[in-house]
Regions:
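Short boundary motifs at domain starts and secondary-structure transition points
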Residues: 9-14
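Positively charged, amphipathic N-terminal segments that serve as targeting/anchoring signals
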Residues: 1-2, 7
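A glycine- and small-aliphatic-rich helix-loop capping segment at beta-alpha/alpha-beta transitions
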Residues: 38
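Single, function-defining residue in the core of a domain
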Residues: 3, 15-19, 23-33, 42-286
């Protein structure tokens, strides 16, 4: 699949970063009476989808299904990190040993620092010509025994004022070449994986299940992920610019009517141009 995000593609070229990935999880809750094998949490059952999402191509790279009782950071040391790529996570993944696994893979990460983490400032790299939102840019090292044992090398800590939230946020990264404002900008792209989770839950029906066994549930979820990737591949091959949801609807028409998908796409795009805008916002526009 070709790159779909020109801003990230530009950053990839400018700073020699091979790829950008968001890592996050999403829970699916269900009734314990129908799924008694699930470990109860607050009176309900559930599963968790641990996902690595390709931000450049806007497709999932991998998905691991576990019980919803598993912590997000449990599998940090098992993800297939690639040399030269950058991984963006929320503070649930602030596990020093897991972050050092990314460092050892010669990859990069961006993650918000937790409030209770103790560190020593080694160097202040804040530049006077930084955007006003950049409050500080420092080189630090962990000082607590457990944190330093997990991550013994120096790190970069960027403090950035987020206007939308009305507060400052601090981001840890092992990339010392990116401008401080780009570190904060890249963290915003983590939202794309949330959009992906919302999309598959709404349109590929993974909130209700046909079977009640754990195996049946996993088959349905992995089928949904596979269907999403196939749709994305087909849309990319045909240079389709509309929403993936509309593309899926067009594919369903071609199952009952003998018509080329290319003709359906041309017909839809003509309708969209007549109306001024696509009928639905594109997932790939986020």
């Amino acid at each position: 699949i070709k790159f779909r995000n020109p801003q990230l593609e530009e950053l990839s070229v400018s700073f020699s970063i091979s790829g950008f990935f968001a890592i996050d999880s999403s829970s699916v809750k269900f009734d314990l009476s129908r799924y008694p094998w699930s470990v109860p949490q607050q009176g309900v059952g559930g599963i968790k989808l641990h996902t690595m999402y390709d931000l450049l191509r806007e497709v999932p790279r991998m998905c691991l299904i576990t019980g919803h009782e598993e912590r997000d950071q449990t599998f940090m040391e098992d993800y297939p990190y690639e040399k030269g790529c950058l991984y963006i996570m929320d503070k649930a993944y602030m596990k020093t040993k897991g972050l050092f696994t990314i460092e050892e893979a010669k990859a990069f990460f961006i993650v918000p620092i937790k409030r209770n983490v103790k560190y020593l400032v080694l160097k202040d790299d804040t530049k006077h010509d930084n955007p006003i939102e950049v409050m500080a840019d420092r080189t630090i090292e962990f000082t607590s025994r457990w944190a330093k044992a997990g991550y013994p090398k120096n790190l970069r800590l960027v403090t950035y004022y987020v206007e939308e939230k009305g507060k400052a946020m601090q981001f840890l990264t092992n990339n010392f070449k990116l401008p401080a404002e780009k570190v904060a900008l890249l963290y915003k792209y983590r939202w794309n994986i949330e959009v992906f989770f919302k999309w598959i839950k709404q349109h590929l029906r993974i909130n209700s299940f046909y079977g009640t066994s754990a195996n049946a549930m996993m088959i349905q979820i992995y089928t949904a992920f596979t269907a999403y990737c196939i749709l994305a591949l087909a849309a990319d091959a045909m240079s389709y610019k509309g929403s993936l949801y509309d593309f899926a609807n067009m594919i369903s028409v071609s199952l009952t009517e003998k018509v080329y998908v290319r003709d359906l796409i041309d017909r839809y795009q003509e309708m969209s141009e007549d109306k001024g805008d696509p009928l639905l916002p594109s997932l790939f526009d986020f």
